Amino acid sequence: MNLIIRRIIPFLLIALAMVNGGANISAQERSKGLLIRVIDDETLQPLPGVLVHYGREGNVTNEEGNIDLPQGLAANTTVSFSYIGYQKISLSIDKLRRSKGGVIHMTPITEALEEVVVTTEGNTTRRTAVGQSIGALTLGMQMGKNLGEAVQGVRGVSLISNGVSSSQPVIHGMYGERILILNNGVRHKSQQWGQGHAPEIALAQAGRVTILKGAESVRYGADALGGVIIVEQASLPYSQEGIKGSTTLYGATNGLTYGVSGKVEKGMGHHLAWRVLGDYSNSGDKRTAQYLLNNTGQRQWSMLGQLGWRSTALEAELLISSLQEKEGTYFGAQMGNVDLLKERIEMGRPPQDVITPFTRKIDYGYHTTSHSLAKLKMGYTPNNRHRFEGMIAYQLNLRNEYHLRRNKLSHVPESALVLQNVEGEFLWHYTANKHLEVESGILGTFTDNYNKPGTGVVPMIPNYVQGGWGVYTITKYHTDMWGVEIGIRGDGQRTEAVGIDYDGQNYGGIEHQNNLTYSIGGYAEIANGLTLRSQIGSAWRAPHVSELYSNGLDMERGIYMIGNKDLKSERVFKWVASLSYRNSWLHADLEGYLQWVNNYIYQEPTKAYRTLVSGTYPLFAIKQTSAALHGVDAEVTVYPFSWLSYTISSGMIWANEQSTGRYLPYMPPLHIREEIKGEWAVLGGKHKASISLQHKFVAKQNRFDPDTDLIKFAPPAYHLVGLNVGFTQGGIAKNSDIIYRLSIENLFNKEYKEYTNLARYYAHDLGRNIQFSISYNF
């Protein structure tokens, strides 16, 4: 690690020195009109209907794939080329004029992951950022899964689970409230209730998911300690003629899952566009390799609507979305007494005589959740130098938890939470010239969380209100070969909590937080195809109310949680760097990171138990320490032939308490992933076929402290094998196709346990799952 630091830091220092030395900026040249031809990089056939945006205007290529860019565009004007199923390309007018023959080669999206680069204005990623994105085609293969499951294949990203469907992403060892999730540009707030449930985000509503791995507090504010996950829609199709969309039917053998999703969108006269999405899924009891997991069924409904309008300088967009979910709680995590609970944890699985036949019925206990969002976003671009953006959003989150209760009261929720949030943001983007940019913004947010009365149970967390503000500025200087970015941000937060405990006593209080964070990053094209990115930054988060005052059952994990009102704010200093190499047959990436966390918050069993009407549960307490985390992730993809690729990736993390060296709990062990994939054009290129074989190895977690767990050992290592087969049937109609997908997870039905699945105390992970989907795109 020291060698990596010695080799990487000098590049960042050189970049800073170059900024301080200044640069001569030439006057902007003006284009004289430019004819561009867009073709498929594999078939060399022209691509009609490609969306081409330049400045505040846009158009589409004709039937021959040609477009004539207008005269008068500045040499540094960015021109972007977008087409469904192809990787987006963004180039300046100056580069287009120097391109060979004025021909743009667009590459079909065949890889699951794309590197994050700067493209057009308003994009959520930056060239200095270390991260990756998952495109719409790959998300289409994740139907029926949650957000954490969809992103766990990204370098440096793993999963922490609380059962068969409640999981959260882990970035460089950070999870829960340390990962900020932006749902269509709005901070997802329901995670403040605790870590026992997955984010209420439907993948069917996502056009793209981006994972940023640095300490991103300067741009995104508090809670972005470990990174940011951005779930967003594709741009509205203003220039699209006619109605387009898709519909997908999917099913899976594990849980006998079935579902349907659909999308319809249309552009109207280049100034108006709309989009509507919908999704429904239904599943019953899931299954391990050897036995059923009773009461693990799930129902989910979601919808999203967008309406956008734009003129030469103004634009406005309204987005409304809603998600409803009902999910059962595994019976095996609900024991009648302490002895039975200890026996079940020692067995690590339910006895065969208590397992009942498969059913879709969701019985007590279960929970229902609802997430609704409304957002209005506006933009104003008076000229090529200035752009202003404003956003206001409202979200409503509801959660009801039902348990088996006495006196026929099971239909009354034991917990009924309502969380409302209003968020506003105003941004200013200034482009001084083709090298220098400045972005500044101000954010305000207000949250009101309360417990509905009438449950007959003391709430797990108190009622609270929380207000916050943030102001930041980021300066970016970039050339074709290198660039730097420096940012600073100030934040303030006030939280007032009021509750009543089991003894009828009031508790709570008022917390004030003010923080200053900063970041500095850079990139350098060291050689042809070799790129270095590095970022250093600080971040912070205040302890959430659930960590301060929790006193109740976390039904997802089957544990009773006790908060700690003396917690202090977590403060992080993080350095992350990546080195990537690209040529026609080899893609290689190496990432390293160091994180120092003051006042690291974690959960630890107390070795005590709490008995409720619904069962007996282990007692966990919230604790705090100073921690150090560092790790490395690597990935190599080889293309021996144009139709064949082989990818291998691996990641390792070390996480310790600074004062004692003691291992931190729930850190992912060493893992290795492999995939060999073939793709072919068949029947003269009219159709496409693909097949891939995956292998995953997860080592036993030897960096494990038994005092931080309910059991004295970590699960053994395991191997999993998967298979994916796809076929795209083209020529159904103009611009239409049908995609057939078949995937098999855990092909050999391996029985195993994942260390970071907190339900491993009671059961194994899922067995074989065969999934099939058929999508019609029109």
Residue ranges and their predicted role:
Residues 100-105, 138, 147-150, 167-170, ...:
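N-terminal periplasmic accessory domains that precede
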Residues 205-207, 218-289, 295-303, 311-314, ...:
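Outer-membrane beta-barrel translocator/receptor signature
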Residues 37-43, 51-53, 82-86, 97-140, ...:
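Short, acidic, small-residue-rich periplasmic hinge/interaction motif at the N-terminus
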Residues 70, 149, 187-215:
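Short acidic/polar hinge/loop motifs at secondary-structure boundaries
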Residues 415-427, 562-568, 574, 583, ...:
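Outer membrane beta-barrel strand-and-loop segments of large Gram-negative receptors
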Residues 593-596, 608, 615-701:
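Gram-negative outer-membrane beta-barrel transporters
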Residues 540, 596-599, 603, 697-704, ...:
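C-terminal beta-signal and adjacent terminal beta-strands/loops
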Residues 283, 289, 294-296, 300, ...:
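Flexible loop and strand-edge segments within Gram-negative outer membrane beta-barrel domains
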